[in-house]
């Protein structure tokens, strides 16, 4: 299990591509930046943004 991490900018987008794969994701900067850049988030948080 990967520990929660701060993911910002390109790192955040790369992580979403890895987690969501072919499903793709919806990028809502305000929500996900608040959740994953300002605070650490985990893989389950990222999965909430997959399509």
Swiss-Prot record:
* Protein's UniProt keywords contain Disulfide bond: yes
Function of the molecule? Insulin decreases blood glucose concentration. It increases cell permeability to monosaccharides, amino acids and fatty acids. It accelerates glycolysis, the pentose phosphate cycle, and glycogen synthesis in liver.
Protein localization:
Secreted
Q: Which GO terms describe its biological process?
A: glucose metabolic process
The molecule here is called Insulin
Q: Which UniProt keywords apply?
A: Carbohydrate metabolism, Disulfide bond, Glucose metabolism, Hormone, Secreted
The intrachain disulfides are: 8-37, 20-50, 36-41
Query: Which PROSITE patterns is this protein grouped with?
Result: INSULIN (PS00262)
Any single GO molecular-function term of the entry would be: hormone activity
Q: Which SMART domains match?
A: IlGF
**By its UniProt entry, which PANTHER family does this protein fall under?**
INSULIN (PTHR11454:SF9), INSULIN/INSULIN GROWTH FACTOR (PTHR11454)
Q: Which InterPro entries match?
A: Insulin, Insulin-like, Insulin-like_sf, Insulin_CS, Insulin_family
Q: Which organism is it from?
A: Platichthys flesus
